[in-house]
């Protein structure tokens, strides 16, 4: 019996609409489930149609190759959250589709500390959990308690932060992104402490100002490469003489060399060519192999 779909499917969807790079090919089907039941139904439909299924966040570190993806790409959009107070501490349960920075701001305004480092962090909670997002002295691994997951497109489970095996910008979830129907993060439960709303808000405003000053203008997916141990990817790329190098409409930023900017109509191939160039030059000159922080489909 065919699976009834409670979620809208968008055929031949240009994924440039869903990537901060504003570049990339099409997905055969694109969907935005907003509940676990919708995600389960979508996974069942994809299995029935014998189509590969990939879960994504908000596309802030995503590039789909120009030839596109012959399957289903889905972005989970549930955004509910619930705060459970325990005197001077609290736990907040946040669905994966909620914006990381916006949620952190709301909690700070309520006097809850723990996520203020996420000010200006692009993307949603789910992607942050998968990639152990971090900046300005904080990271997901330090405050996450548990994650609610959908495994094999059918089984809802809860994993502890230890189960996720976090390292720098890595998790076991990230390693499983390309295996069968990959795990989907449905929600995360985070640890908070009571703080002064004015002080927390002031800190977040300072972080936002610093981030704005350091972030190149234009369409990008943020840091392209992870920082190697004891060094910075941007410094190495700059030292290799690649600042400002352009292929098509893709450019290695003159402000921060670990950013690749779409200056107009860049193709995924242009961005990938700059990625390969940076990797090759840095490896040749410094003997360091840069590892991607962005996700290529």
UniProtKB/Swiss-Prot annotation:
Active site annotation, chain numbering: 169, 223 (proton donor), 293
Protein's GO biological process: cell division; cell wall organization; peptidoglycan biosynthetic process; regulation of cell shape
Cross-referenced InterPro entries: FAD-bd_PCMH (IPR016166), FAD-bd_PCMH-like_sf (IPR036318), FAD-bd_PCMH_sub1 (IPR016167), FAD-bd_PCMH_sub2 (IPR016169), MurB (IPR003170), MurB_C (IPR011601), MurB_C_sf (IPR036635), Oxid_FAD_bind_N (IPR006094)
Record field: transmembrane: none
Pathway: Cell wall biogenesis; peptidoglycan biosynthesis
Required co-factors: FAD
Subcellular location: Cytoplasm
The EC number(s) this enzyme carries: 1.3.1.98
Catalytic activity: UDP-N-acetyl-alpha-D-muramate + NADP(+) = UDP-N-acetyl-3-O-(1-carboxyvinyl)-alpha-D-glucosamine + NADPH + H(+)
Top-level division of the source organism's lineage: Bacteria
Molecular function terms from GO: FAD binding; flavin adenine dinucleotide binding; UDP-N-acetylmuramate dehydrogenase activity
GO cellular component: cytosol
NCBIfam families: murB, PRK13905.1
PANTHER family on file: UDP-N-ACETYLENOLPYRUVOYLGLUCOSAMINE REDUCTASE
Protein purpose: Cell wall formation.
Name of the featured protein: UDP-N-acetylenolpyruvoylglucosamine reductase
Species per Swiss-Prot/TrEMBL record: Chloroflexus aurantiacus (strain ATCC 29366 / DSM 635 / J-10-fl)
């Amino acid at each position: 019996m065919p699976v009834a779909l409670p979620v809208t499917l968008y055929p031949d969807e240009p994924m440039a609409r869903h990537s901060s790079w504003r570049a990339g090919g099409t997905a055969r089907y694109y969907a935005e489930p907003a509940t676990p039941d919708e995600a389960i139904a979508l996974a069942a439909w994809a299995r029935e149609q014998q189509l590969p299924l990939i879960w994504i966040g908000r596309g802030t570190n995503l590039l789909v190759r120009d030839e596109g993806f012959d399957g289903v790409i889905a972005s989970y959009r549930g955004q509910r959250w619930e705060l459970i107070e325990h005197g001077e501490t609290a736990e907040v349960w946040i669905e994966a589709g909620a914006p990381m920075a916006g949620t952190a701001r709301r909690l700070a305004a309520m006097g809850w500390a723990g996520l203020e480092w996420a000010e200006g962090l692009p993307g949603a909670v789910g992607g942050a959990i998968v990639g152990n997002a971090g900046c300005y002295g904080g990271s997901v691994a330090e405050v996450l308690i548990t994650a609610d997951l959908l495994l094999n497109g059918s089984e809802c489970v809860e994993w502890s932060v230890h189960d996720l095996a976090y390292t720098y910008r890595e998790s076991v979830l990230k390693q499983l992104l390309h295996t069968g129907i990959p795990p989907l993060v449905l929600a995360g439960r985070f640890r908070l402490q009571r703080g002064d709303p004015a002080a927390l808000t002031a800190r977040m405003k300072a972080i936002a100002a610093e981030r704005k000053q350091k972030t190149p203008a234009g369409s990008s997916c943020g840091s392209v490469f992870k920082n190697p141990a004891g060094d910075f990817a941007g410094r190495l790329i700059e030292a290799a003489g690649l600042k400002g190098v352009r292929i098509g409409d893709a450019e290695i930023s003159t402000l921060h060399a670990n950013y690749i900017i779409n200056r107009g109509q860049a193709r995924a191939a242009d961005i990938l060519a700059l990625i390969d160039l940076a990797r090759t030059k840095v490896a040749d000159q410094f003997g360091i192999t840069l590892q991607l922080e962005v996700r290529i489909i």
